[in-house]
């Protein structure tokens, strides 16, 4: 195995359980604004809609504002909400709940603690800055992360190669063999690594083009230590 120096870790569904975070925040939002208790099926419907919009954003087919408006408009339609839908208010309340909801995987703290003894850890994430910073403040593994790179602040989303420019500006190390991208998304994280000629570790199951693969984040020290 190469002598990596920098681990570029995805945030959501890699270190943090975003599926559960999303479920809680969405439920609180629709209960507050519409007095509605969402079913698991309805939450799954939103998950699919939201994921679709994020994939379109990665492909530069929509803007961030179109994503925010479209996902809530489409979801409200699926729920049969027929009155005028104020997507701006729904998104604002939803993201406020997201920023306060911290659900990390049980192994994340110990994984980051152990790996930080050998590697420099960075987080690379597509997301809204105040939401990601808010959740990071409550993360137990925060002391072991050197810096968080957020698409909102950089101005581009993974898998765009330009995202890596921000990382290089921070490290000053142009040797791409020193980096490893770790994440759960084939279209965002793994493709990003391929786009910038950096090795990748896919967190998940199934066939994939990554350099390495682990079932979940708890297995990362076994691979790298």
Tell where the protein language model's regions lie, with residue ranges.
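Asp-based, Mg2+/Mn2+-dependent phosphohydrolase catalytic module
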Residues: 1-7, 113, 127-225
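N-terminal helical cap/lid subdomain that shapes the substrate entry/recognition surface
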Residues: 2-106
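Solvent-exposed, flexible loop/coil residues
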Residues: 20, 71, 106-109, 140, ...
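Catalytic-core regions built around general acid/base machinery
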Residues: 107-118
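Glycine-centered short loops/turns at secondary-structure junctions
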Residues: 118-119, 197
